[in-house]
């Protein structure tokens, strides 16, 4: 299927690994140009993979909690390509900042998981108006269910869902579409490392997947990335303000369905 995004330019925060890396690769596979923003250098293997798919890809090493750095990154992309067709806000991480951790840690968590979503959209919006582009925000099922012991992260992810609808409403007349994907249990290298911290990793993984109704398995990065790229593409041209949960029924389906 041709998603009709060839040669379009997409900024992907946190696009060098995990879910963001999957989205960058999926964009490149469709002929789009991913401009990857991240704090750490790209791993050589990943860079080579994306370059093989899209030689025009670009990486900007930047600190997303620095507003001026975000503005500079957007300007660098515009200077290189002359346009921005979409923004994928993905960077962040579950930092276990609980109600008892403290106010300053909570503020830092919001900076790392929420504020740069706004900052990047703020600096991209002028170019997105020109291109009638799209914004894709990556949230989390914790925004809908809670998790326990992670107030900062869940507050950020809930706010991301609210901003998705607010921005969709704000820019209807400009033809800018804004949607969110809501993952639950996605098998990324980071998730694998977390599972391996348990004394019996295989048993821990089994306790997780038995509660995922569809197939009793983890969501793959590719499955989530495919949905994200579809929502960015013209094939979803009448879809905006939506929260698309990609989780094998984990969040919403009756738990009795998980019985094997």
Q: Across the structure, where does each feature detected by a protein language model lie?
A:
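Conserved glycine-rich cofactor-binding loop
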Residues: 9, 16-18
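Conserved mid-core segment of classical short-chain dehydrogenase/reductases
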Residues: 93-108, 149-152, 192, 256-260
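Active-site helix of classical SDR
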Residues: 121, 156, 164
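Residue(s) in the substrate-gating loop at a strand-loop-helix junction
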Residues: 140
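Short C-terminal tail/terminal secondary-structure segment
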Residues: 145, 229, 240-260
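Short, small/polar-rich loop/turn modules that mediate ligand/substrate recognition or access, typified
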Residues: 172, 177, 239-241
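Catalytic Tyr-x(3-8)-Lys segment
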Residues: 201-223
